[in-house]
Amino acid sequence: MVINCAFIGFGKSTTRYHLPYVLNRKDSWHVAHIFRRHAKPEEQAPIYSHIHFTSDLDEVLNDPDVKLVVVCTHADSHFEYAKRALEAGKNVLVEKPFTPTLAQAKELFALAKSKGLTVTPYQNRRFDSCFLTAKKAIESGKLGEIVEVESHFDYYRPVAETKPGLPQDGAFYGLGVHTMDQIISLFGRPDHVAYDIRSLRNKANPDDTFEAQLFYGDLKAIVKTSHLVKIDYPKFIVHGKKGSFIKYGIDQQETSLKANIMPGEPGFAADDSVGVLEYVNDEGVTVREEMKPEMGDYGRVYDALYQTITHGAPNYVKESEVLTNLEILERGFEQASPSTVTLAK
């Protein structure tokens, strides 16, 4: 069975992070429509020849064959478009952040349930190579009880042109929404969250630097982003009572896509970095292992959605995980940073 889908938006998100994976899954997905406000020259590319481009959203929403609508627009329009698609009887996938507010997310989930549909965020970075490798190390049990995880998503981009905006336009919403989701997918809802959210490069802009510390009993997960890191820093550091894991290097899918190397082509997402796992085994002997990176694949979002829509499989991101993530994001701006909040059980 092939599912017909449609996209709202035809910017970088759609063309770089979605279409290369969907178009590589012709046995399960067919892109029927793309809604955009104005025509673009890129539409003429042969790879898009089968897609109907339109500036009339009703053409998309009124097509009974479309079973999934993917919202890839600016964050402040996510809620409106997702709600319209659900009201039209479509399942919905929404780019990050899912919605600007927690209340809007709850409304979308309630609407989807009332119509027997699914609505979910595009948490493609659950399928980053670096995260999957760290996850494998954690789940191996070789580290024993995990006491600390540190996740970095850093750049060296010291100059920032003036672009004032809202909190959802900053790094905490833009990148933290992914890196915190990774932590939540592993450990669930934290007890407390400590925040340090700042704008360092241009004070007129939303935040570009943050550190969030998620506390789970004796476990602390640290999620950090900076645009002022010149020397490569580990992507993941994990400490347990029996050992440690460290992984340099970020997933290479985006690098390949920028170089016009597509999924399925030779060399796509090639990554020669390794993770290092060092632990004390049951015999008291220190063991050092190199872990080859797991294969990243953002298309697994669509594989999971296919199973949800066709077979009723549980959504790959739980509703509770989405709401926890958005609550953490939202509460980070309730008071001046640094700050600490306690989450309700």
From Swiss-Prot:
Keyword terms: Oxidoreductase
GO-annotated biological processes: antibiotic biosynthetic process
Enzyme Commission number(s) of this protein: 1.-.-.-
A GO MF label: scyllo-inositol dehydrogenase (NADP+) activity
GO cellular component: cytosol
InterPro entries cross-referenced by the UniProt entry: Gfo/Idh/MocA-like_OxRdtase_C, Gfo/Idh/MocA-like_OxRdtase_N, Gfo/Idh/MocA_oxidoreduct, NAD(P)-bd_dom_sf
UniProt xrefs under PANTHER family: CONSERVED EXPRESSED OXIDOREDUCTASE (EUROFUNG) (PTHR43708), OXIDOREDUCTASE (PTHR43708:SF7)
Family: Belongs to the Gfo/Idh/MocA family. Biliverdin reductase subfamily.
Protein name: Uncharacterized oxidoreductase YhhX
Organism this protein belongs to: Escherichia coli (strain K12)
